């Protein structure tokens, strides 16, 4: 009787502790985005190309679906991560990510970096090798950018979003003979090296623009997500950030 009661009490204690542990873990693992400020560094997709209005951008939608207090949108259409060899007065030529990340506001709670598709699409910087540390090659620019962001925001979550699939992205680019996946792989590897969390939309966005029905539904021009595509990004980003 005594031992049976002890066993019962032990099981009850374990259940109680397990419940408390689960609640503790849930609180520990859940990031409350309400009231936060997020810096978004990106290209035309971040800027909102393809959407019908500002409110339909995935960045702005984070206010609606996650309660984010302030969105700082540093998206500039056409920009690349790496510096260009031929620089013009066009914004997309002179404002690569490595050049402009340092000008972002310092007081962000979360930083989100979303780029690489333009490096594949029309960037003239050499692809380089993973040992590069210069912003003049794509591989080097990934290192330069990630390390620079960590130094600027040493205690804040820095999230990397891979490029989305785009139409015909298995075709090697003319200058370097690289597919979009080659660029994505460098971004993944660089993020892993610096222990930055990756929202891998190349692998898990669920949209392949080479399939006409999905292209029509989510990115009619084969590259820029429409309103439905932006909401899909926002929902995935919310879930990802909350789990950090």
Language-model features and meaning:
Residues 1-41, 45-72, 104-107, 151-156, ...:
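N-terminal secretory targeting modules
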Residues 32-39, 45-140:
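Conserved SGNH/GDSL esterase-like catalytic core that processes O-acyl groups on lipids
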Residues 93-244:
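Alpha-helical cap/lid subdomain in secreted, periplasmic
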């Amino acid at each position: 009787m005594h031992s049976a009661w002890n066993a019962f009490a032990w099981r009850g204690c374990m259940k109680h502790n397990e419940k408390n542990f689960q609640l503790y873990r849930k609180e520990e693992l859940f990031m409350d985005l309400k009231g936060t400020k997020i810096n978004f560094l990106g290209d035309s997709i971040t800027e909102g190309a393809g959407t019908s209005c500002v409110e339909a951008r995935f960045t702005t939608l984070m206010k609606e679906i996650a309660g984010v207090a302030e969105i700082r949108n540093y998206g500039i259409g056409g920009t690349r991560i790496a510096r260009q060899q031929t620089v013009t007065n066009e914004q997309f030529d002179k404002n690569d990510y490595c050049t402009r990340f340092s000008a972002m506001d310092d007081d962000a709670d979360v930083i989100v970096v979303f780029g690489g598709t333009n490096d594949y699409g029309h960037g003239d910087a050499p692809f380089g090798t993973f040992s590069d540390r210069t912003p003049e090659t794509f591989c080097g620019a990934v290192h330069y950018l990630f390390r620079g962001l960590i130094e600027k925001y040493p205690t804040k979550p820095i999230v990397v979003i891979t490029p989305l699939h785009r139409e015909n992205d298995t075709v090697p680019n003319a200058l370097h003979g690289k597919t979009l996946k080659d660029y994505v792989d460098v971004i993944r590897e660089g993020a892993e090296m610096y222990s930055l969390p990756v929202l891998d939309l190349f692998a898990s966005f669920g949209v392949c623009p080479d399939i006409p029905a999905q292209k029509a539904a989510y990115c009619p021009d084969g590259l820029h997500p429409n309103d439905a595509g932006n909401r899909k990004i926002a929902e995935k980003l919310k879930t990802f950030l909350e789990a950090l």
